[in-house]
Amino acid sequence: MNFPWDQLLVQGNWMITMGQIGAPFAVIAVIAVISYFKLWKYLYREWFTSIDHKKIGAMYLICAVLMFVRGGIDALMMRTQLAIPDNTFLEGNHYNEVFSTHGVIMIIFMAMPFIFGLWNVVVPLQIGARDVAFPVLNNVSFWLFFSGMILFNLSFIVGGSPAAGWTNYAPLAGEFSPGPGVNYYLIAIQISGIGTLMTGINFFVTILRCKTPTMKFMEMPMFTVTTFITALIVILAFPVLTVTLALFTTDRIFDTAFFSVANGGMPMLWANFFWVWGHPEVYIVILPAFGIYSEIIPTFARKRLFGHQSMVWATAGIAFLSFLVWVHHFFTMGNGALINSFFSISTMLIGIPTGVKIFNWLFTLYKGRVTFESPMLFALGFIPNFLIGGVTGVMLSMAAADYQYHNTYFLVAHFHYTLVAGVVFACLGALIFWWPKMTGFKLNETLNKWCFWLFMIGFNVCFIPQFILGLDGMPRRLYTYMPEDGWWLLNAISTVGALLMALGFMFLVASIVYSFFKAPREATGDNWDGLGRTLEWATAGAMPPKYNFAITPDWNDYDTFVDMKEHGRHYLDNHNYTDIHMPNNTPVGFWMGILFTIGGFFLIFETLVPAIICLIGIFATMVYRSFQIDHGYHIPASEVAETEKRLRDARIKEREAVSHES
């Protein structure tokens, strides 16, 4: 085994050196805290090996928030570098590493796990299910994502991060990027992507087979509809990424030539394959965000969602068109007028179903009794900001104009107005909105609103100047510029905006910490003053029991829960309980994740023998699980009845306390 020890440690940069020193101490500190409080057995039994969709969702969300912090630090480093001309805060290659990892982390390791975490927490509850269709696969999916996340973040201090951009274009990412950096990109995303594909299959089947029998597709909550359609996009798009990453991996490790011109390959093949996955990937994160807004807006407008069926068809239309627009990412690569014209038109067409959604949200607000809780503020802030992203997207869809905009900060501002205003606003609003379902208490509304206003104002202060910089000719991926370029003031303003966004997020962290210690614990499952409109708010307690629902709920309309409350069937009380079957926890996913991490690390450094041994271990684990007889366990009806009575008594006590105070 010839391990390249000379490539292991990155040298010559003080920030990376500090990371190399600090990371081991951070790991030791975490291990020490867990050991001091004797939590290892609890974490392993109740979390690491759990197949409970709610706990898996919480683990996804914890990782996503941590990656939001990591990606945000990358963004602040870039904005600090560009705040003044001729800055030496970051040297050129380090800047390239930072913006490359920023893009990958924010899309692959923040936005997607955030969405998947919400899927896990909310969707089974919304469809009246006890768990997902494949609970063990759900656990495996999480640990594969976690493995990819660990490997990708390890690159900063061990071996060096990828520096060819988040798109990793050949030939720059091929023969012109020696070392393990690009290998980290290929292997980490490959492992995480396999987990993502499993998640897509799991939720597609869950919604088809596990929803309450009376729930019809066109009557499902919009978040569930968008989850179903997004899961289908995942199933269709991610195999393309899997194959493409595998081909590039063989180029780098086994000297094949799929993407190398010198040996008969075609770099443009990578661009096509990448964006055949890459543009549907945008809708993998934005469609569930649309579903989130379709839950929040009717709740705080106290009104039915306007045009529910048209929203379903619009979602399906966007999903279909998402596979027909990938060439607009490289209009400038010389495809020819006919091809560019086709993809220009198909890109513009996406504005039609998206416009339908915008107007439906506005009509939902019209004559509604709107209240401005913090989730609603994020939803309302989304509409005008996302509209800016949409309008500039139509500008970029014109192939002739794209030649002017494409390689400038105008494009950077555009996609941040779609992804931040569309996805990040949704994630933050959803975290606050569904927080009581995970913890049993609400976050502090005052701090939440400070978070919203600082984040939204900072967002516009950060990215509106970038539109102007782009029109003035500032290229993207530029790590420094000269004073005579005249870009200093707008870059400085943009940096101030980024700092405001960071400050806003710190208010959300403060809200979480403050509420953990100070917020009253709630008993009701309908946490937002009884405004809930879907089944996740119909659980017997604020935090659903492990079986979710003691009896299978009925669902006859997308606002059935409102009707249930009007007729006094709010909590599905029933004394004819039966035994409930539940699956057992499993260690399979956890150990597969460890094997993927170790094997992936050795493959990144092109040390094949240990990687092959780990691969054999992975297959052995799968075989072991395949022959394991596990019938799960049953929760006795008496225990269900006792749990439901305890939760019912807590609700009554809480209601009496509120009545006494008023």
Curated annotation (Swiss-Prot):
Quick one: which residues bind Fe(II)-heme a? Answer: 102, 416
Q: Kindly list the positions annotated as binding heme a3.
A: 414
Describe the reaction catalysed, as an equation: 2 a quinol + O2 = 2 a quinone + 2 H2O
Query: Keyword Repeat, does the record have it?
Result: no
Signal peptide extent: none
Location in the cell: Cell membrane
Disulfide bonds listed in the record: none
**What pathway is this protein said to act in by its record?**
Energy metabolism; oxidative phosphorylation
- Which keywords does this Swiss-Prot/TrEMBL entry list? Cell membrane, Copper, Electron transport, Heme, Hydrogen ion transport, Ion transport, Iron, Membrane, Metal-binding, Oxidoreductase, Respiratory chain, Transmembrane, Transmembrane helix, Transport
Question: Crosslink 1'-histidyl-3'-tyrosine (His-Tyr) sits at which residues?
Answer: 279-283
UniProt-listed GO biological process terms? electron transport coupled proton transport; oxidative phosphorylation; respiratory electron transport chain
Cofactor binding, per record: Binds a copper B center.
Which Pfam families does this entry report, sorted A to Z?
COX1
Regarding the membrane, this protein is recorded as: Multi-pass membrane protein
Q: What's a single GO MF annotation on this record? A: heme binding
Please tell me where Cu cation binds in this chain.
279, 283, 328-329
Q: What is its main location?
A: membrane
Name what cofactor the protein needs.
Cu cation; ferriheme a
Family, per entry: Belongs to the heme-copper respiratory oxidase family.
Q: What does this protein do?
A: Catalyzes quinol oxidation with the concomitant reduction of oxygen to water.
List the protein's name: Probable quinol oxidase subunit 1
Q: Which organism is it from?
A: Staphylococcus saprophyticus subsp. saprophyticus (strain ATCC 15305 / DSM 20229 / NCIMB 8711 / NCTC 7292 / S-41)
